[in-house]
DNA sequence: CCAATAGTGTCTGTGAGACAGTATCCG
DNA sequence: CGGATACTGTCTCACAGACACTATTGG
């Protein structure tokens, strides 16, 4: 019964990589090639290795799956999931990380045999393996909250972007429509949120928009609060 | 080298139990009786057991250390700490939980040989074993944020409390002074925050104050935002 | 009466939301 | 010129903070 006091287990690190593509919030998923849940969609992840920090493991998985530099991207710990029966192979506790990426040209330059692809969150939110549906739900809610209180929305965009691009991120992630004029005033007035680059982008139609880059601020004071506290299933 | 792919480790669950006592934010700490960091202060915790969920383990530790029912108290997962060298005994990853308790008469009715006691956060914030200083910092910051956006402050109080008691919680946790009149209006007007019991409490001096119990709401709309974004080390 | 705490009413500045109006591109 | 998008100005309402004032106890 010393086993009760000293349970040995394996620790997995799973990734929820979110982006905004084609006007939708999308998540990077893989199709499982092996044993449990074979053929099912799942979040990318892997086991923690010796000598590795949790964040290091998350960054390593991120590179393996998307060829993205985890040290540059936004990457934050989400939560840890440890229900005894969450993995049929045995006791596996999973630390989930939330990553935010701009719209990448091709997601899967990975080396793994498993195919990786972007999928709209709405399309896969109930079809993932393990307890990944719950993890994805928690990740989306975290991202929505981060948009309220931090400058995270700029990470969804590329290195330079217009105020309209930034507004588009908010509208897609929150699933709302925002007044472009009020949003512009709000964002420009918030110190450290965005910095003008001096250049402009000429759209197919309409007046050219000023291009910005992300500012130095991390937190938003005051925050951009959502009107309704998100009551969508 | 299969060891690199399948690292086995032990998972600990550590608790940050906060309360407001004697006008200070205090945390429950134990004095370590055994091997690493013997005699040093540390957060209470223990290893995950077979068949146990993470939250179950946290509730079990909570009962062992404080004889409090973890199912009733506020208990939320804080974060997971997994630096390779965080525990001299070997690879141990720790899932930290944040618990909020009202001012208890005696903290240590626990069975463990280790002595448990309340200590002001300020007094122990740099003297804890392992990486518990960092965990404590994160926990306090989480609690401060929770007070802004949830009705968590009522959990610091007993089953019934006055508006002044509730204000006292905010003032101690945030380390600020609040206008009693504005605070009262704000709290009473927020639907679901507090419910009148119809009874009153007679203080040593002054007008009797109405007693309330916690309301049904969990989230605060709108939130009670701190003025300054906490720049204390 | 005074001291002390509880609670109400009022003013003011700030910011969000609504929306008219102006600016600048393409065709 | 019209169509479309970017951006500015103005109004209104709600709320946070400051603070005068009233209410209710004990001594």
Model-derived features: positions:
Chain A
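The catalytic Nudix box helix
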Residues: 48-76, 97, 166
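Short, P/G- and charge-enriched loop/turn segments at secondary-structure junctions
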Residues: 1-5, 83-86
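Core RNA-modification/binding signature centered on pseudouridine synthases
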Residues: 9-10, 16, 28, 33, ...
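Active-site-adjacent beta-strand/loop module that shapes the phosphate/pyrophosphate-binding cleft
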Residues: 23, 83-106, 139-142, 210-219
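Short, solvent-exposed loop/turn elements at beta->coil junctions and helix N-caps
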Residues: 79-86, 199-202
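NUDIX/MutT-family hydrolases
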Residues: 96-99, 107-143, 147, 156-164, ...
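A short catalytic or substrate-binding loop motif that flags glycine-/basic-rich loops and adjacent residues
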Residues: 6-11, 89-93, 204
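N-terminal strand-loop-strand
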Residues: 2-42, 55
């Amino acid at each position: 019964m010393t086993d009760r006091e000293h349970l040995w287990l394996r620790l997995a690190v799973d990734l929820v990589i979110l982006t905004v593509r084609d006007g939708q919030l999308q998540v990077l998923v893989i199709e499982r090639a092996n044993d449990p849940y074979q053929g099912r969609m799942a979040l990318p992840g892997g086991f923690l290795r010796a000598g590795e920090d949790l964040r290091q493991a998350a960054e390593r998985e991120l590179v393996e799956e998307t060829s993205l530099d985890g040290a540059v991207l936004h990457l934050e710990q989400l939560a840890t999931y440890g229900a005894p029966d969450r993995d049929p192979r045995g006791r596996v506790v999973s630390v989930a990380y939330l990553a935010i990426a701009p719209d990448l040209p091709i997601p899967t330059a990975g080396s793994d045999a498993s195919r990786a692809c972007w999928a709209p969150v709405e399309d896969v939110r109930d079809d993932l393996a393990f307890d990944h549906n719950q993890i994805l739900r928690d990740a989306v809610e975290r991202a929505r909250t981060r948009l309220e209180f931090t400058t995270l929305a700029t990470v969804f965009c590329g290195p330079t972007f217009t105020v309209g691009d930034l507004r588009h991120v908010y509208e897609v992630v929150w699933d709302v429509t925002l007044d472009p004029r009020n949003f512009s005033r709000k964002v420009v007035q918030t110190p450290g949120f965005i910095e003008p680059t001096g250049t402009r982008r000429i759209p197919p139609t309409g007046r050219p928009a000023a291009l910005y880059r992300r500012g130095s601020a991390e937190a938003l004071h005051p925050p951009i609060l959502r009107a309704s506290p998100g009551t969508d299933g």
